[in-house]
Amino acid sequence: MKFLLLFLLASSTFAQTAPPRLIVRGDDMGYSHAGNEAILKCFQEGIVTSIEVIVPSPWFPEAVKMLAEIPTADVGIHLALSSEWDNVKWRPVSDCPSLRDADGYFYPMIFPNKNYPGRALAENPWKIEDVEKEFRAQIELALKKIPRISHLSHHMGCSALSPEVRALAKKLAKEYHIDIDPAELGVTNVRYQGPSKTSEDKLQSFLKMLESLQPGKTYLFVDHPGLDTAEVRAIHHVGYENVAADRQGVTDTWTHPRVREFIREKGIQLISYQDLKNQTRSR
């Protein structure tokens, strides 16, 4: 009992003195050329530690080339079963009829959306065997092109389509040895603490979030870098029309000198999914 109490006391002391750890995840690489450039910029000049790539997206081939230029970047497969934008679309990479709309694209939404009635995957007769076929095809293509893939994530929450899909995604992650689940490792998701409409809003709310991080705990912050270019201004869907300005704000925040300075001052340790996996193995 004495030794147990000493161990618990030592663990508690370590948790209080260890720095906060933060994964900064940039999602949706591949949806546009400018999006690819933004993620590259946020990794090279900013604080991004993990990058999520959408395999069926139109700019995936360019993403593969860009990721080869940054071999130390941690990369995850952002499994996708939807194609949400009105002016740019992507299709499954496998033969999975129940996941396609009448034009052969993924449905724009995963869950029912008043702006897209009847056009959510959940509202249509999808089949689990098609989901498995598509997930496997995306994973295998990603591993072929980017062998260092470390983990999976899920675009627009597609794994929440049903408990069956969630279990399938977990099974495949283990089968392909890319099973890192932050939730199972005690990682806390964090968001902007305050308004996030403009670049300045994002910056101040991100700094406020950083200020709230506690010693000894591990956190995950997710957003979508982009650039305010003509290309991205043409990418939108009903209910999210300001994509370019919004995602430029993410890039501005993640590359802002004040953010890096604050992280250094507070002693926050930036880590990746792969770091999380390595640290778990070493325990």
Stretches with model-predicted labels:
Residues 28, 75, 152, 221, ...:
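Conserved, mostly hydrophobic/aromatic
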Residues 180-183, 239-283:
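C-terminal domain-boundary segment and adjacent tail
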Residues 39-45, 62-74, 91-105, 143-144, ...:
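Acidic (Asp/Glu)-rich catalytic clusters
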Residues 29, 54-56, 78-84, 157, ...:
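Active-site beta-loop-alpha junctions enriched in small/polar residues
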Residues 88-121, 237-242:
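Active-site gating loops and adjacent loop-to-helix segments of metal-dependent hydrolytic enzymes
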